[in-house]
Amino acid sequence: MKTTVEKLSPTRVKLAISATPEDLKPHIDHAYGHIAEQVAIPGFRKGKVPPPIIDQRVGREAVLEHAVNDGMDGFYQAAVKETDIRPLGRPEADVKEWPGKDLTGDLLLEIEVDVRPEFDLPAYEGLELTVDSVEVTDDEVATELDSLRSRFGTLITVDRPAKTGDFVQIDLTATIGGNAVDTASGISYELGSGDLIDGIDEALESLTAGESTTFESKLLGGDNEGETAEIAVTVQSVKERELPEADDDFAQIASEFDTIDELRADLKVQVGKSKVFGQVTQARDQIVDKLLEGVEIPVPEKLVEDEVQRHLENENRLEDDVHRAEVKESSEKAFRQQLLLDVIAEKEELKVSQDELTQYLIQGAQQYNMEPNEFVQVLQQNNQIPAMVGEVARNKALAVVLDKAKVVDADGKVVDVTEFTKPVVRDADAVSEEPADADAEAVVADAPAEEAAEAPAAEEAPAEKPKKKAPAKKKASEKAADSE
């Protein structure tokens, strides 16, 4: 097999692959065997039909097409390895020349695919970053204390109009064109939380128990999702939350402290820690922006456009040109950021240990309220484990860059970020880049060996087979049926 590569743009190449009859022979043999299992020809058992009979009843063209389809991905993967390109997205294949019916002559393929662009990595040592100063106010501590008190509060029924912060029990009926499309009874809702449909807070404001009103809103789910419906709401009861007194007794009930002053002091520390974390988040965002300012990274247009299209389809906003432009800009920046961190991870020889991957997957499962094994199985089914490994590697790359930076607050005080830039694994055994067949429990279990991978989320090619541009021909089994 011979391969040449033509650079179409900084982010796209064309592979010209020439496969000899010898290269194609194993796939020809496989095609005959597979077709023999499919077709029913009088006088022959399934799987025992000889090639000459298949040629006669099905046609040599069907055999060739089957062989090419069977071998195309292998030829493509071999070409990728031979040319050292870094594919992104789904390749598109075109058969330029078929072997002759006598199985002589080469198979000529042209495959276009987006590739990772080359660029010079900007210097990232000693970058200076300025973040907000940390100052905890009494009001912030009071807000945290009130939040804690609310968790220990009790709901008391009141005979007055509902207001923000009250809990109401309501019945809802949605109608479209005079027909009821959805109903719900006995819903408990905190007025002002915004957890239900648009317009519900305004509609409930000032209503008392037993009163009803109507308003219009778009439905968020069900068969009529996205349609505007008339919503009838009836208030069954209004309750307010009665908070416990902020005293020593409350401190002893709600915490390990004996006095309310000790509890307030601890809440102040917790608010401070949260703000320090905010400083680190600020620094992380700044450092990525600074690095991107210093380098030009070409973006694969088709890859970005496909992502934008998927995003807009999910939001049902395909006609919103302003939003399309916003999503495109965001997608392009995300791609550049991913690629930049991928290259830094490679330069720093960062590895992803099994334990690091496990912790990341467990956190992801918690975010989606799923069991870890269930979450991993979903990722495996969608071949997304390598992408998760890439995410962990990029996070580690960002930690390395942040560790090399100088971070100060607005007052010039140095911000200690070492807690968030712990030493990273650099020389571990490699995690498989194709773990999709792994047992789910093994993926999320603690492992004695540290493993790593070079699997950035954008590099999808190993899991993608070339998509043919040519129209599909009739299946071999259909041809056999036509010839009988």
UniProtKB/Swiss-Prot annotation:
One of its GO terms (biological process) is 'de novo' cotranslational protein folding. It is found in: Cytoplasm. Belongs to the FKBP-type PPIase family. Tig subfamily. Pfam families: FKBP_C (PF00254), Trigger_C (PF05698), Trigger_N (PF05697). Gene3D superfamilies: 3.10.50.40, Trigger factor ribosome-binding domain, Trigger factor, C-terminal domain. It catalyses: [protein]-peptidylproline (omega=180) = [protein]-peptidylproline (omega=0). Involved in protein export. Acts as a chaperone by maintaining the newly synthesized protein in an open conformation. Functions as a peptidyl-prolyl cis-trans isomerase. It is an enzyme of class 5 (isomerase). The keyword Cell inner membrane does not apply. InterPro entries: PPIase_dom_sf, PPIase_FKBP_dom, Trig_fac, Trigger_fac_C, Trigger_fac_C_sf, Trigger_fac_ribosome-bd_bac, Trigger_fac_ribosome-bd_sf, Trigger_fact/SurA_dom_sf. Consists of 3 domains; the N-terminus binds the ribosome, the middle domain has PPIase activity, while the C-terminus has intrinsic chaperone activity on its own. This is Trigger factor. Its main location: cytoplasm. GO terms for molecular function: peptidyl-prolyl cis-trans isomerase activity; protein folding chaperone; ribosome binding. Residues 429-484 are annotated as: Disordered. One of its GO terms (cellular component) is cytoplasm. Residues 430-440 have a biased composition (Acidic residues).
